[in-house]
């Protein structure tokens, strides 16, 4: 029997008692930093028991409570750890502060550009009077957002059945609703819009840096991705009262939460739902999250979270229902885009051909022709990006970029694709990875894109079409 007993111990180590684990030790209740057990354990006061034993997990006063049966309350053990984890996520660390410093520097540069543009490019070149401080920012789509926030979508029974209608229902209600809310505190409309983009941009760059650190191990990856975004050609639209900054401030944290949390999680579905109220691109985000869900779930219990992915689609559905009540058209926002911006469906090759004609056949004024050339270049960049993502088997990101390209590349001609590059966060992470492997890449990128960013900024701030 002794030989048999030793063999059993070797095969089943759990059957072998630990040294010193006698009956007294096994029956003793766990020492905790919570309340005392009624079964004769030492009374706990403050951070440790009076008998001089440390609390569980080595942190005084945070390690849970002991139950009457001598077991530890696991929920109370996890709560402090979760609090620390959330504190680390919400409180900016040193790397986050570097990102925010970079963000503030670029904002100062853009505002300096706006100041100079206001003096150098007035509407009347011979006027001695300078325009209002906020005049350069009140261009193009800003007027639609202002009218929606101030007057609503259908003021005074006006609508698409009237001549000269501005097709404002083409714009989703997320940004105008936030603008109206901020306006209750900040009376000046333009200031309220700029403040929204300023705060949203800060949230977006912090989230982008953290997403980049999920993909790239280098500590400089996040700051490098943010640098490439903030100095990209169309970065002016992150500072203006437009939807790009607000959308990224919702979409990037949703993407980050989807990668960090276990399924199910209401956080990223709620953020994605809010993103869908800002831009139709939110639906592309939902599709990417669905692909990510399908590739990462492992258990039947996790699959039960699948219906939650339908929650973000409620936002466009509710907006379509609202438009239907006023117009009788469930797709009124899409038809408004077709009337105002030629976004009726065309085959991709037809859209390319029409844009090429506008860019090089001298059929449009030179400013519009140059922006058409930028549209073609942005489409090429998007196709290459989608191809690289597919080759790397990053299917969720490839779906997100691919759907964006399909939506933008099937109109009569290309419109606002350079602006859409701001929303392609896989592009900035990919460029950051290349720059970390090839140090000269950063210098090359900055030398090429910084002048283009200035050109786009001056174009927009002076009231010309900038995509």
Which residues fall in each region the model found?
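Membrane-interface alpha helices of multi-pass inner-membrane proteins
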Residues: 230, 237, 251-258, 265-293, ...
